[in-house]
Regions:
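Perimembrane helix-loop-helix junctions
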Residues: 3-4, 186-220, 284-294, 336
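Signature aromatic-anchored transmembrane alpha helix within multi-pass, membrane-resident enzymes
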Residues: 216-220, 343-369
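Hydrophobic/aromatic-rich transmembrane helices and adjacent perimembrane loops
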Residues: 185, 313, 319-352
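Short hydrophobic alpha-helices at membrane interfaces in multi-pass membrane enzymes
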Residues: 155-174, 204-213, 300-310
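Membrane-interface alpha helices of multi-pass inner-membrane proteins
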Residues: 26, 164-181, 187-192, 221, ...
Length: 495
C-alpha cells in the first residue's frame, strides 16, 4: 500500500473514531430527552417567543445574555414548530459540533491518534447529566461554536487565502460571544497563540499579526451587529443586561458564589477529575520541548491546546455563579489535552481510557436509572422542573382567551410549556430579588387591575423575593387559592 493510500486509510479511521465520539455524545443525552426542560432552557425559549411576538428585548422580557442566544432560540422554535421538548435535540446537535470540533483541533495540532482519544473522551464528559451536559445551555452552545472557530484558525495555515480563514474564525469567535459572555475562550486562545508566534518567531511575525487583525475584523463584524441592534432598541438597557448587571451582582468581580463553587465542584471532581489529571500530563508533553523550539524561533501549534485550557478556566471564573453547567466550559479543552496524554500511553491506552471514563459513566448511569420524574432531581437537584409541565397543563386547561399566568417568584420553564408570554420581565429568582426596581415593578404588575395575571403559580414564598410584604398583601386581598400541584399553590384573581 502506497504512502497516499495509507494516509487516506488513517484519515478514514480517524473519522470513524470521531463519529463514534459524536454518537456517544448523542447516546449520553438520549435518556435525558425525556426529562423536563431546565429553568434556563425554558426561560430562554419563553423570552425568545415573547420577543418574536412583539415584546421588546431587555425591556418587556429581560435576560442577562447577548442577543445571539435569543436569536438561536427564536430560530429553533420556528424550525421545530413551537415544540418545547425539541430543545434537547438542539443540545444534541451542538454536542456533536463540540466533539467533532475538539477532535479536529487535536488532529491538526497533535496528530490523528490524539484526536481519536480526544473524541471519545469529549463525547462522554461533555454530555454528563450531572453537569447539565444534556441541556441547551449557553456554555454548551457557545463552547461548540468557539471550538469550531479554533478549528478554522488552526486549519488556516496550509490553506489558500489564509486571512479569509482567520476572518471566518473571528466571525465564529464573535458568534460564540453573542451566545454567552464567557464564549471568548476559543478566540483568546488563538489570539494568544498568534501573539506568541509574533513575539518568538521573527519570520512569522508579519503573517501572525495580519492573521490576528483578520480575526479581530471578523469579531468586529459580529460586535457591530449586536451594538446596532442595541442602539435601535435601547442602548442603556442592553448594556445593563449584558454587562452592567452581572458586574454589579454576580461575577468574578462582585458577588462570586464561592460556596456554590465547592458544592458543584464535587460533581466536577467525579466527572472531570480523571480527565483533568490526564490533561495535566498532556500539557507537560506539549510544554516540555518548548525550550528547544523557542531557541529555534519556532512555536508548535499544539501550544494552542494549553492556551485553550487557560482561557476556558478564565471564562469559567469570570461568571461568578459557578453553576454546574459552568464546568462544561472545561470539558472540551481538558479532553483535548487528555487525548494527547493517551496517545503517549503505549499499550496502556485502553486501560487509561477506562480509568478516565468510569467515574463519569458511573454517576451518569446513576442518573439514567431513575424514573422520568426523578431525572432532573438527580441530574441537577432541580425539584421545580418536574412540576412545570403539570402547572402549564393545568393552566392551559383552565384559561380563557386573554388570561395569563405569573410564576411566583420564578420557574421560567412553566412559561415555555404553557406557551405563555411573560407579563413581567424577570424570569429568574436572582433577578426578581436583585435587579434594579424589580420588586416595585412586580408589585405594580400584580396590583394593576387591568394587566394583573389571572392566575399565579406560587413556587416560592412571596417574602423570598419581596421582603416588604406587599406581594403577600396583594395575594390575600386580590387572589384566592384554587388548587395545589405538588408543592405549587395556584391562585386565581378574584372579581
Amino acid at each position: 500500500m502506497g504512502h497516499t493510500a495509507l494516509m487516506i486509510a488513517e484519515r478514514r479511521q480517524t473519522w470513524v473514531w470521531i463519529g463514534a465520539g459524536a454518537l456517544l455524545s448523542v447516546l449520553m443525552r438520549l435518556r435525558m430527552f425525556w426529562s423536563p426542560v431546565s429553568v434556563d432552557e425554558g426561560g430562554f425559549l419563553a423570552i425568545a417567543r415573547g420577543w418574536s411576538h412583539g415584546q421588546v428585548l431587555y425591556r418587556d422580557v429581560w435576560v442577562d445574555r447577548p442577543q445571539g442566544l435569543l436569536v438561536l432560540f427564536r430560530a429553533w422554535d420556528w424550525l421545530s414548530g413551537g415544540s418545547t421538548a425539541s430543545i434537547r435535540i438542539m443540545a444534541m446537535l451542538f454536542g456533536v459540533v463540540l466533539v467533532v470540533s475538539t477532535a479536529l483541533v487535536v488532529r491538526e495540532v497533535a496528530g490523528s491518534t490524539a484526536a481519536r482519544w480526544a473524541a471519545i473522551i469529549c463525547g462522554v464528559v461533555s454530555a454528563t447529566p450531572v453537569l447539565e451536559g444534556h441541556s441547551a445551555n449557553g456554555e454548551l452552545i457557545s463552547g461548540a461554536v468557539a471550538a469550531a472557530g479554533i478549528v478554522v484558525a488552526v486549519h488556516a495555515g496550509g490553506r489558500h487565502r489564509p486571512l479569509l480563514w482567520f476572518f471566518s474564525a473571528g466571525l465564529l469567535g464573535g458568534l460564540a460571544l453573542s451566545l454567552k459572555q464567557s464564549g471568548f475562550d476559543g478566540l483568546t486562545a488563538i489570539l494568544g497563540w498568534l501573539v506568541l508566534r509574533a513575539a518568538l518567531c521573527r519570520s512569522e511575525r508579519r503573517r501572525a499579526l495580519k492573521s490576528g487583525v483578520a480575526m479581530l475584523a471578523g469579531l468586529g463584524v459580529v460586535i457591530a451587529i449586536l451594538m446596532l441592534h442595541a442602539a435601535l432598541t435601547g442602548w442603556a438597557r442592553w448594556w445593563s443586561a449584558v454587562a452592567g448587571y452581572r458586574l454589579k451582582t454576580q461575577s468574578a468581580f462582585s458577588g462570586s458564589d464561592w460556596a456554590n463553587l465547592l458544592d458543584t465542584g464535587r460533581f466536577a471532581v467525579v466527572t472531570l477529575g480523571t480527565t483533568a489529571i490526564a490533561a495535566l500530563v498532556g500539557a507537560i508533553i506539549v510544554v516540555r520541548p518548548l525550550r528547544s523550539h523557542v531557541r529555534a524561533r519556532m512555536l508548535p501549534a499544539s501550544v494552542v491546546l494549553v492556551l485553550w485550557v487557560l482561557t476556558a478556566t478564565g471564562a469559567f471564573l469570570v461568571g461568578g455563579g459557578f453553576w454546574r453547567h459552568y464546568w462544561l466550559l472545561l470539558a472540551a479543552p481538558l479532553s483535548a489535552l487528555a487525548g494527547v496524554a493517551l496517545s503517549h500511553a503505549g499499550r496502556f491506552k485502553a486501560i487509561a481510557l477506562t480509568a478516565l471514563l468510569v467515574p463519569c459513566l458511573a454517576i451518569s448511569g446513576w442518573v439514567f436509572v431513575g424514573s422520568n420524574a426523578t431525572l432532573s432531581v438527580r441530574a441537577a437537584a432541580d425539584r421545580r422542573s418536574p412540576l412545570d409541565e403539570q402547572v402549564a397543563r393545568w393552566f392551559k386547561a383552565h384559561r380563557k382567551p386573554g388570561e395569563n399566568l405569573y410564576v411566583l417568584c420564578a420557574s421560567a420553564a412553566a412559561y415555555a410549556y404553557a406557551h405563555q408570554d411573560p407579563g413581567y420581565p424577570y424570569l429568574w429568582f436572582i433577578e426578581v430579588r436583585d435587579a434594579p426596581n424589580a420588586q416595585n415593578m412586580l408589585v405594580s404588575y400584580l396590583g394593576d387591575p387591568r394587566l394583573a395575571p389571572r392566575y399565579i403559580a406560587q413556587y416560592q414564598r412571596a417574602s423570598a423575593c419581596d421582603p416588604s410584604g406587599r406581594v403577600d398583601a396583594i395575594l390575600r386581598q386580590s387572589y384566592k387559592r384554587v388548587t395545589s400541584i405538588g408543592y405549587v399553590v395556584v391562585y386565581e384573581r378574584t372579581p
